[in-house]
Each structure stands twice: as C-alpha cells, then as structure tokens.
C-alpha cells in the first residue's frame, strides 16, 4: 500500500509530447552517454544465491536493484534511503523497474564493422569506399591486407595484398615506406580519411560528363549516399563500432527454473560470446601474442558481434545447446513474431472475453445477449466501485468476496452498471470495419453470446460454432465513440458500395416471400377491408387466406405531410408487410405490393433509409425480421425428394446432344475439322444441353398447378421458393440436383469433354463420380491457399493506403476524370448513374439533346440527380476524383465525394485509404472461400455473336467491309464500330466489330431489338484477302515452314504453318500467301502495298496453292485458346498482379504515336515493326516482336496512339507513359472491377482510385533544372512540388518530372515514414537505409502513430491534431503581428529552427 501512497506525493512525469522521430547511426560518444557502466565479465547470476555477479551481464551496480528500494547486500531498505548509493555493494536504492531502462556497454579491444551496413544490400560501407563487398569481407575477416598509404612505392592506394605479397612488399620497399592495414581498423581509417564534400563535387562533375548509359546510374547511387551522410551529420566511421551497447537486463531475462536450471534469452548467450572473445583478445594483446593468434581472435570477435546483431546474415548460423538458431537483435524486430507486428501493431486487450455465439431473434438491432457470468467478470471494477459507493463493502477485498459469492445485490448492481454501457463484439477474421461493432448488452442465462440475426452478414457469422470476442470500452470517450460511431444501428450501409448491409437473409426472406405470394381462387377473394385489424380478424377465423386477392385501405402521407387513404389491390399478407412501412410520400405501397425476393427487400430498405432516415430504418428492419421469422415458422415449408422434379424432356435433349457429339467425332475422323475445333464444338454442345435441361427443369418446377377439385392453386414447390426468394440455394445448385451436373473441369482448368449426365437425385455412376472429384478437391485446396493470399493482399493494400486521410474540404482543382457506362457485348453492365452516384461533378452536366445544364459543377450527385442523368440519356460525365486531387497530404472531401457508409458528404479526418483497402480486400477473402460451392462445374465463357438490345438505325463507323464469294458482308477493318441510333439521333449502343466477323445489317438499315448484328467464329481468328485474284504460296517450304499434319485419329491432313526458324534452312524465310492477277503480278491493296499476307506459327491454311479467291474469303485460320473456366482463382492473382503493377507474361505492345505501320528487316528471331508517326517532328518508332506471335496490324495500316500492335494484357506502365494517368486509372479500375463483377461483388470505383493514387505518389525527374536532383531520381510528388516551389521563389529553373507507377509492395516500402515501412516488410533494409540518411518520421500516417502509441490522426484522433495545428498557426500569427517592426528578426530565428528539426 505504501507504494501507492508514495505515488500520490510524486506523480510520475507525463511522457513528453513529440512531433517527430529521427533515426540515425549512434556515435561512440552517444553509446557511452546511454551507458551506466562497462560490462567486463561474461557471468550472469550466481547459481547458489541467485544474485547477479558484479560487472557481469546482470550487474546490479550498473543496471539497478533487483527489489524495489533495496540494495543488493541488504544494508539499505525502504523508501527513506531513495537515491543513496550503497558503499558496500555500489547499488543505487531506487525502483527495480530501472532495470528495464538502463543500458550498459562493452568496450571493444578492436573495432568491429556493423553487419547491417556491411551486408544489407547495397552495402553502405562498400558504396562509400567504392569497394566491392567481396574485397571488403576479405579485409574485414583478415584474409587480405589493404594499402592505406602507398608512400613512394609502386603500390596503389586501396590495393589488396595477400599475406605473402605483404611480406614481399615489406622486404622490397622497407617496412616504413608504406602503410597497409587489415581488419576493421584499416577500413575505419579509410572512412575517417574520406572528404565527403569533395567526393560529392567530383561525382557531380563525373555524372555530367559521362556518356554511357549505366555509369551515371551507378555514380548517382553513390552520390545519393554521400549526400545523405553530409545532410544527416552522420560520420562514416560510426559504421565501424568501438563500443557495443548492452540492452537492459529485464529485456533479456534470465529466470531460474526449479531443478537448478535456467531459462534464458538467446541474447545473453550472444553477449556472453562477445565478452569472452573480447576479454581473451585483451589478454592476448597484453601478453604480446603472435600476430596470427591476435588476428584470429579479432576475426572471431567480429563474427560474434555479427551474430549478436544479425545471426545468420553472414557465415554459419550460431546455434544454442538445442541446435536451434539463436535469436539475434535483428530477429527481435523482423517478421510476424517481431517487435513491430507482434507487440506494437498487435497488442492484446484486457477486459475482454470470448464465447460461442447463438442466435437472438428477440433482440433489438442495437442489443446483444451477454452471459451473466461473463458480464460479472468483465465489469468487475465498476461493480467494486458501486459496492463501495453504496456502502455495501468497505474494502476491495470485501467487495471481491461479495462478487465471488454472487450475492443478489451484486446482480442488481450489475444491471445498473451495464445499462447504457456499450460493449464491442468482434468476430475474427476482421476483414473490414464492420467486423467490430458496438452493442448494448442484455444479461442472459447460459454461457453463449446472443447475436442479432441481421448483423450476421456484416460479421460474416453463422451459428455453426463460431466464436466472438467481447471488449469493454472503459473511458467515457471510448464509450462515446462506441455509441456514436460503432453502434450497429449506425452501420446500416456497406462501406464498399453504399448498399444496405443489414439485409434479411435465409428464413426471414423465405417468410416474407411466403407472405407476399398471391394466388387465384383462394377463399375470401374479392373481399374489401377497411383496416389491418379487420384483416387480422378475418385471417383468424379463416374467412380469408394470406394469399387471396383482396382490396384494402392503405393510409399514407402526401408531400405536405397530410395523411390520406387509398384503396389498393393486394393480399392480406402484403398488407401485413405494408403496415410496417414508414409513412412517407417517397415510400409508396408498391414497394411491398409484389412478390418480395431478397433483392426487393434490399431495395425496400435502401429506399426507406434514403427517405426516412436511420431511426425509422432500424425500427422497420427489426419489425420485418420479426414478421419474416414468424411467417416462415407458420408456413412450415419443408421439402422432400419428390420436390426435385426431373423433366421428362431430359432424355430427349441428352440423346440429341449425344448424336451431335458423335457427328463432330465423325467430322473429325473424316478430317473436316481439327482436334481443337472438335473439342470446342463438343464442349459447346454439352454446355448448351445442360442449360436447356436446366431451363426445362426450372419451367417445370416453377409452373403453377391447379387443384382440379377446389380450383385453387397448389402449394408452390418448396425448393423453387427457396431459390427464387434468395433464401438458400441457387439455380446452379438446383440444376445439379434435378437437371444434369454438366461439364467438369480438370485441375488444370481445361474442361473434360464428357459431361456428367446424371444429377444428384438419380445418383452418379462410378465414372461420373470420379470425374467430379477433380472439381471438388480443387475447390477445397483453393480455399485453403487463397484465404492466406487474400489476407496478404489486404495487408499490402492497407499498408499502401494507410495515410490517405481526408485533410481538407476542397482542394479547388479543376481536374477530373471522365466516366462512361460500362458496356460489354452490347449490354449496359453498370449504368452511368451507378458510377457517378455520390461523386462531385467537375463540369456542368449538359442534356445532350437540348444543351441545358442538368447539374452544375462542384455538385454532389445524389439519387435524384441520377434519375435526371438516366432520363436525359447522358453518355459521359466529368467528375472529380482522388486521382487528380491536389491536396498536399491526404485527399480532399470534394474529390472523394460521398461517404458510402453514411450516405452524406465525407467527414474531415475520415481514413478513406484504410476503408478502400478493406473494401477491396474483404471480398477477396469471401470469394476465395466460395470457389467450391458450384462443385467445380464448368461454365464456358464465350460469345460468338452480337445481339441488339435496342431498336433503331444502324450506323457503321470506319466502315471497311466487303462482300465475300457467298455475298455475305465481312468486316475487314480492325477498328470498325457499329452504333445503334434512336429516332432522336442519340446513340443507344455501340459495339466494336471483330476482324473477320460476318455482318447481317449494313449502314442505314433498321434493326429490331433482339436481332443479331454480326456473328463470328469464336475458336479461330481468320486472315482475309481484300482483293480478288489467285492465291499463291510464298516461302511455304514443305517440312521447313509448313507441314501436312495428319491427325492421328483420322489420317486426314491439314496444312499447318510450323516454326520455320527451328531449322537452319528456314532462318530467312517469310511464309506468306500472296494474291496475284491472271498475269502473275502481285496485286496492290488500297493503301498501295502488295497483297502479301504474312503467316504466323500454327496458322491452318484454308486455300490451295493457285486457287481463285474472292475479297473477304478466308486464306488461313489461327486457332485461339480452348475455353477455360474463369473463377476467382484467375481472379485473386489477377487483382494482385494489377495492384503490384507487374508486367503481364505476354504483354501487349502499344503504339506510342499515331502513324503508318511498316514491316522492317527482321532481326534474329524477331519481327521488326516500324511506326512512322503522322506528326513529322517525331522519329519513327521501332518495335521488335517475337516471330510467330500474331500481329494484329497489316503493312500500311494507320494505327492510333494507344492502340495495340500485339494483342494481350497491356502493361500498366506502358499505358501511363503513352496515354497518361486518366487512361491508366480507367484501365486499372475496369480490370479490377471485371474480376469482382464476375463474382457479383459490388465495389465502388473510388476505392480502387484511392489505391491507384497511392501507387502514383512518386515522380521521376526527367530534367533537373537548377535543382540538386539527378535525372532518373525518384521523389515523392509532395517533395518534388515543395522543391519546385522553392526554386521558383528564388527565380531558378524548376525541375520537370513524369509520374511513376509503383506496385503496392514497393510503394509501401517507399513511403516517407520509415516506421511504417519497417513494420511492413524487409525491416532490416528499411532501418539501415533510414539510419544512414538520418531520416525523420513526421508521424503523419496511421501506422506510425499506432506504433509510437499515440492516437491516430484520423477520425476523433485527427481532431486534436487539427486543433493543435490551428493553435500553433494562431500563435505564430500573433508573434508575427507583434514583431511586425522587425520581420527580418523573426525569419532569422525560423531558419535554424527548420534546420534543427
């Protein structure tokens, strides 16, 4: 107790507030200033007395007493001797916790190189001295001498000499004529002799004068390091240590176990080795031992210090007694178990508990059920203080007894304590911020936590044994934040897409679906009801059923808020739901007057939230939930095996397809089609068959059946109800239950040709069962692997985006990006309205027909505006985007737009970066877990025709078509587009036509909805002739460039172009088909070139030598890949590839300028393509393309800047360089969205944009102007702008730079904050780099602040920082006003302050 009393009298000094943290290399003086004494002996603790040995690693004299206020020998005990140093044992009487703070040091007998600066690549010592790492190690580990001072001899400075050479040189030149050294001492002398300023100046000159490509890069690296040393004030020789600090003993504890053994930290072993070797070296030096022995001892000392700092970085790993590698200081920081990630970013929490969750349907949305036992334990301190306040107990001990006995008054007090005190519930894995929410606890019996059913979706929880953790917010501020920000009722919308996340599912959906069914000829049809109570009465006496068609009176409000009633045609069930709807003019009864599926319910909740606000929505959701559960229970829906109806038509359909497959097989045997074409066709046929069986089955199951006697409709099929309502199951699963399972994929992703004809009801044959195991097993394996991958992706995303915070209301930029609807194969997949909802306009939005302003600029687009945009049929809108935001640090509110989770403009201090990362990462994990649900059934992703979705007139842009010999229109151009124009002349749809597709309509034709515009063969890419004439082969040498490939199965041969470069004879062949006229002259094409069509490898010839061809005929076909299934497996790695900005394997080659294409002279095995730009001032651009790749342009084509010369995925860096930031952003956003859309996951574009903004935070200097930067140097965009602003202020030429795209891992490691980077990856490298350049961390991001233990500068934590900043500015202004007479003085004071910081 006396300890506490004392603490009242001397309150501990509050920790000093600090604004930044600097890291640099410790000088020997600095190390000594930390130390409380030198450690001379390797001993630790006396094993009999358990007292620390004097001058040893645990010495009490150096580090402080073991017991509070008690010296070692026991002469001084108690507080009153505080601060006295005992004359007998030399220990200061003070708190024992100083043993956690005080450091010691070891005085080394010989200097030692710090391994981090030596071995962490690039080696800093090596760069400084301009020596290779190999040479350095030779000197440091005593293999070679190095010449320090050649004197008048013919030796060179820094020349390495072996032992023999050194002795020879001494003999030859005399011992004193030159100096050579060995070991760290020699390196240290070289370091001390460096004149950094001079070297820097020399290097600058050298870089300016150098002509080669690589040299300046190398020199620039060295120059950068030297400048870092000059700027930071670090001295190079500090990288060689003469003292070693020893960390406090409590941080490397030694604990006696029973049985006389000790458990110790590995560091003690490592320190002991260093001390032993150091002492031995000292003794040998005193004894004047032979040089070779001393050298050996010094080498061993160097090795032991290396092991202490970073064990295993060089040479063998030092192991302990049990053969396990010892954990060195570097290992303490590194990795998931290191200091950063284990203790600083991932702390454990007191006042928490965990238990299994069960469903609590009678809870309100803001409540959770907390077991009494748990609550009693968690709220103990509150209960104690209440007991004391009420006078029921005098001491804490008494209170403890009362609580342990569980007296009745304790329960009463617990009820009081718990009232209005929210608790946090968390379910691991916490993938997004909705994984932790606050609830008000309700005490319950039992041992399981009760959870409200509607929040399950947010937690991704189910009740099959999931556990959840409970945390108690203690302080008033914490309770306030929990209630205002984290309460489940405040988190109704999903932060990723702004749709409601509190959506009923499963039983509730089924109940609501059942209630809203409408049937004919029910008892009570046509009755009229005046109120809901009448309906309830009628239902109770069975005068009417839930599903009867009746009329009823519904009361609602008009726009002025007055009530009025209307009579509606509805059913009693729908009236029950309608009764719960909040009354509002914009919430019509039509919302519930329909068959409610999950999607309708979600829409209904969304509408209610937008118009009636949060409170109404929460009440409404709770009521719907209760109704849904009650009705599902009353309905008693169940299903049996007979509910799975297998259609009779199945046998017929299967038989038809079987004959088709046999027919294709026969065609293949006859040699009419290739193996690949047969495979594709068979797979196609079976996929169609499966779909048709599924359709027939769905019609069968969903058909309404009438009972002949009562004329009433029969009960709807239960399985259909479940799937159709969205409660459970999907058509895909029903197809497998009662249709046919269909095609299966091999583990490689290829589709097996033979489908599974049976369904689960019939049962699979052994062979079918075996085929289906592939998919099932792959699904399970995928799940395990990808959960980890997805988690890692989220971690990288969070790390790159963590310092994107809303820092200002509006940055005032005029920039923005233009957004258009997403159209695929003519379908509008994402409408323009959906894409711009919640964004700020960058320009006025005009009505394309009338030209009037629909929405002014700088206006936040809401739902009403979206309707306006859709009605006016606007095609594109320029909106503000975080990509073009000009806020100095963070992002501004106007560029970000709406906060999706609240539906309001985003607040200041919102951590939008983390929200973006979670929104992208969270579904990744969800999706990876969802691969095996469809049991690996293959879905062929393919389209081979375009259908019109609108009626209108056809308009063909860049029309380049010909009629072939059959009179069919064939597309000959690569950028032909077809547009459908409505009667007002507005463009309804636009499709790009593939080369070689067959057109059904021509320019100006009328088209109806659903008619096919064009068709093409999806399996091959044709090569067409543009002129009529006679086809002749060129360079098609049998056996070299062309082979008759006889199909093994059929014996029929087709002529295939083979890789002609493989044989020596074919090296200069250029296989082609030329078209000649009757006289044998090569015909000319429209663009003036010869009609020569170059062939690529694997092309299959379709014409014979000398055959007559007609324009538009196919000369050759190039087979495309077989259909592989796409599932998120392709997805997750694809998302990672995009965010990491990797170059794809076969990346596309993009034209850098608009120009004419010409084929140059081939180079080895590459084709040379030259683009002659239209703009005369530009040089022609050459591209080398591997032969055999199919090039999508012909000689003489005009290609636009940004178009593909070689198809494939484009490399994002190319898009940035050629088309700019906006194009790059559009590409990345669309590609990422494609992956997620395939899985039906909605993510708002702005989240992806936030990540892309952080990938573009660096710029590369192109011309340095008058700055001190170097060409090719990468700078932070903010740093670059600051630098240029300073240069302009001084009237100097500013530097110019281009944006650089970095992958997320690289961008995270290159943030301005070294603390954040070190806690992410490659800790050693980051810290080494930061220390050398004396980096300062300004603590602006979230992560750095968590690590140093401060509030994060976002949300409520950001408020304090802003206030402090404002106060600081105010003070500065006042000082400036007061010192108005002498402004110069104040500026002078400021300069060194900046420098000092």
Swiss-Prot record:
Keyword Cytoplasm: no
Domain of life from the UniProt record: Bacteria
Key word Metal-binding present: yes
GO cellular component, one term: DNA-directed RNA polymerase complex
EC number(s) stated in the UniProt entry for this protein: 2.7.7.6
Signal sequence segment: none
Binding site for Zn(2+) 1: 71, 73, 86, 89
UniProt feature, compositional bias: Basic and acidic residues: 1388-1397
Keywords: DNA-directed RNA polymerase, Magnesium, Metal-binding, Nucleotidyltransferase, Transcription, Transferase, Zinc
Entry note: cofactor: Binds 1 Mg(2+) ion per subunit.
Region (Disordered): 1368-1397
Assembly description: The RNAP catalytic core consists of 2 alpha, 1 beta, 1 beta' and 1 omega subunit. When a sigma factor is associated with the core the holoenzyme is formed, which can initiate transcription.
Similarity remark: Belongs to the RNA polymerase beta' chain family.
Name of the protein in question: DNA-directed RNA polymerase subunit beta'
Organism this protein belongs to: Parvibaculum lavamentivorans (strain DS-1 / DSM 13023 / NCIMB 13966)
Originating gene: rpoC
